[in-house]
């Protein structure tokens, strides 16, 4: 069998990198020639993780076929618009994910492992256990980081009942204190001062097709929402430019306070009435407070989907 690429979504976060790194390692242990690659450079949080566990960043690829690869495994995503550029021209043989299934179709049967847990890394951990393969320290560290990132250290409503035990076991294998390491990791991802507005709105952004509309939903983590809002003018300029160049109908930016577990929603586009209806708030100067919201997957995208489909 020729080489298989394993990768997470575009604009990769710690779970996209961690789950693909871990699953590629597991596949190699099971005799498959698999390489973890990335669809973008690591963000600051993930760079902290890679440095902490002395792991080289996976190489960034633009397409699979240009690398002579025709079979791929997706982790932490399944929607084609979030995947590699030539996704429709290669064979997807496996998916390991914890998101909704949408805009996904294959010509052949495949293995899909979908679970409503806190992270794709949580699923990969279970697959190690099921195959009786030991998890080395670096893999444990990256899987743990993916889980911490996606659940905001187990505080997000996306946290599954099984996730705390998974986190404790991975922390033990990685040789770290869960709380101390988790907080340091999350804080590393809140350093936004060096980011341009264009970079800031693309750190962690995904496009969703909602009733024929291409809606971009981005998220940045911070310890002070006002710091981000102080740059509102340049952020809005970057958003409007992105809307125009990419054909988005709307752009929603979640500015998430990781210490107090709240978000400010900044929204621009042609369907702001639907965005207001989704969250039962009124945008003032294009933004509004959303108490208790920290999860794009559970507290933003489903609400937008329902509102746009009415």
Curated annotation (Swiss-Prot):
The gene is ppaC. This is Probable manganese-dependent inorganic pyrophosphatase. One of its GO terms (cellular component) is cytoplasm. It holds the Pfam family DHHA2. InterPro entries: DDH_dom, DHH_sf, DHHA2, DHHA2_dom_sf, Mn-dep_inorganic_PyrPase, Oligoribo/pAp-PDE_c-di-AMP_PDE. It is found in: Cytoplasm. It comes from the Bacteria. The keyword Lipoprotein does not apply. Keywords: Cytoplasm, Hydrolase, Manganese, Metal-binding. SUPFAM superfamilies: DHH phosphoesterases. Mn(2+) 1 binds at residues 9, 13, 76. Binds 2 manganese ions per subunit. GO terms for molecular function: inorganic diphosphate phosphatase activity; manganese ion binding. Its EC number is 3.6.1.1. SMART domains: DHHA2. It catalyses: diphosphate + H2O = 2 phosphate + H(+). PANTHER family: BIFUNCTIONAL OLIGORIBONUCLEASE AND PAP PHOSPHATASE NRNA (PTHR47618:SF1). Its main location: cytoplasm. It is an enzyme of class 3 (hydrolase).
């Amino acid at each position: 069998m020729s080489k298989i690429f394993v990768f997470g979504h575009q604009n990769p976060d710690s779970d996209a990198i961690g789950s693909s790194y871990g699953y590629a390692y597991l596949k190699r242990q099971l005799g498959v020639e698999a390489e973890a690659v990335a669809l973008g450079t690591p963000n600051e949080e993930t760079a902290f993780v890679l440095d902490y566990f002395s792991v080289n960043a996976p190489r960034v690829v633009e397409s699979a076929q240009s690398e002579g690869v025709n079979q791929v495994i997706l982790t932490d995503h399944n929607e084609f618009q979030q995947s590699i550029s030539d996704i429709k021209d290669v064979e997807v043989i496996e998916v390991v994910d914890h998101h909704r299934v949408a805009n996904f179709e294959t010509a052949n049967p495949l293995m899909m492992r979908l679970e409503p847990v806190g992270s794709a890394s949580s699923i990969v951990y279970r697959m190690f256990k099921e195959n009786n393969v030991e998890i080395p320290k670096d893999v444990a560290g990256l899987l743990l980081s993916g889980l911490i990132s996606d659940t905001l250290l187990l505080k997000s409503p996306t946290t599954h009942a099984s996730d705390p035990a998974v986190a404790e076991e991975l922390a033990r294998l990685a040789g770290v204190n869960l709380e101390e390491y988790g907080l340091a990791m999350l804080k590393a991802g809140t350093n936004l001062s060096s980011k341009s507005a264009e970079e800031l709105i693309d750190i962690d952004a995904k496009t969703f097709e909602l009733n024929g509309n291409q809606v971009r939903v981005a998220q940045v983590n911070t310890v002070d929402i006002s710091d981000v809002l102080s740059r509102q003018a340049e952020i809005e300029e970057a958003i409007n430019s992105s809307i125009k160049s990419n054909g988005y109908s709307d752009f929603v930016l979640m500015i998430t306070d990781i210490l107090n577990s709240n978000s400010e929603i900044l929204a621009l586009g042609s369907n702001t009435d639907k965005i207001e209806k989704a969250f039962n708030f009124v945008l003032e100067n294009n933004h509004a407070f959303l108490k208790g919201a920290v999860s794009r997957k559970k507290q933003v995208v489903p609400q937008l989907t329902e509102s746009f489909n009415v």
